[in-house]
Amino acid sequence: MYAYVKGKLTHLYPTHVVVETAGVGYEIQTPNSYRFQKHLDHEVLIHTSLIVREDAQLLYGFSSEEEKDMFLSLIKVTGIGPKSALAILATSTPNEVKRAIENENDTYLTKFPGIGKKTARQIVLDLKGKVKITEEDSDSLLQVDATSTVQDQFVQEAMLALEALGYSKRELAKVEKTLNKNKYDSVDEAVKAGLQLVVS
């Protein structure tokens, strides 16, 4: 129904962003909202997919068409909901997920929150041969530039983002200690570092 939303990015939250267009603010769930940090208070285009449930209508947004297509493929798999699909795409590019599927790399897929061995196997069974690996993923429309900000804030916001993706506080306790030992130029960088730690 909504192929994309183009407008001013007004807010960033751990699980979603808000884009204002024609006087309406659209709440859009994203894999990693801090990818959009550079564009806060500026115009942005986000590829979207509307999912209607009995209790809600949720808009999901992505920085590229490849990412959106991968999300739509994942949620067709039995046992994979939008939240799990977002968690996978928060840490991996579409091509990385496709390679794991084509190579039947269940171990790679089970690193994500909510994805056990049975679900990983189902992803492979349902999607192998149906997802095309491109030569290179389309450049993200949203590249985050390094900015100088308070390190503690970066880490705190990164931890909120990781918790929103479904990782437990126990899993994140060690991650937070490691993140606090390093310096980051953006929340997105801290989130990416945290994701690498939690899935390693």
Curated annotation (Swiss-Prot):
- Domain of life, per lineage: Bacteria
Task: Please provide the record's keywords in A-Z order.
Answer: Cytoplasm, DNA damage, DNA recombination, DNA repair, DNA-binding
GO MF term list: ATP binding; four-way junction DNA binding; four-way junction helicase activity
Pfam families from the entry? Answer: HHH_5, RuvA_C, RuvA_N
Subcellular locations according to the entry: Cytoplasm
Region described as Domain II: 64-142
In terms of SUPFAM superfamilies, this protein maps to: DNA helicase RuvA subunit, C-terminal domain, Nucleic acid-binding proteins, RuvA domain 2-like
Q: Its GO CC terms?
A: cytoplasm; Holliday junction helicase complex; Holliday junction resolvase complex
**Region entry Flexible linker, spans:** 143-149
Region: Domain III; residue ranges are 150-200
The UniProt transmembrane annotation reads none
Using the UniProt annotation, give all residue ranges assigned to the region (Domain I): 1-63
Q: Please list the GO biological process terms of this entry.
A: DNA recombination; DNA repair; SOS response
Domain observations: Has three domains with a flexible linker between the domains II and III and assumes an 'L' shape. Domain III is highly mobile and contacts RuvB.
| Family named by the database record | Belongs to the RuvA family.
Functionally, this protein is described as follows:
The RuvA-RuvB-RuvC complex processes Holliday junction (HJ) DNA during genetic recombination and DNA repair, while the RuvA-RuvB complex plays an important role in the rescue of blocked DNA replication forks via replication fork reversal (RFR). RuvA specifically binds to HJ cruciform DNA, conferring on it an open structure. The RuvB hexamer acts as an ATP-dependent pump, pulling dsDNA into and through the RuvAB complex. HJ branch migration allows RuvC to scan DNA until it finds its consensus sequence, where it cleaves and resolves the cruciform DNA.
Subunit structure comment from the entry? Homotetramer. Forms an RuvA(8)-RuvB(12)-Holliday junction (HJ) complex. HJ DNA is sandwiched between 2 RuvA tetramers; dsDNA enters through RuvA and exits via RuvB. An RuvB hexamer assembles on each DNA strand where it exits the tetramer. Each RuvB hexamer is contacted by two RuvA subunits (via domain III) on 2 adjacent RuvB subunits; this complex drives branch migration. In the full resolvosome a probable DNA-RuvA(4)-RuvB(12)-RuvC(2) complex forms which resolves the HJ.
The entry's protein name is Holliday junction branch migration complex subunit RuvA
